[in-house]
């Protein structure tokens, strides 16, 4: 969108879609980060990473930046935070994680969250 507004409408986008905020035609896009784009609000993301006590990396190759660098940022700026990789297989960032749990996210994530909620995790 030309106006940079975010609209929460659930509509099918076409080349003729009109922005409800500025009226621009054909400039709408989904509110996601495409491959090769930089996410908005990186300062806020880094600040949140520096405050975290538990960092989970779920279902990622760990190779696409800037997200691939988040675990290193946590290790450097939030050294007391626990880092956990939940993935199908090890990534290139594997040495940066305190714990590794491999398997389908549909299985390992609920099991890990259950452990956390039951107090059966190390910090």
Residue ranges and their predicted role:
Residues 1-123:
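Conserved catalytic alpha/beta core of Sir2/sirtuin-type deacylases, generalized to analogous enzyme cores
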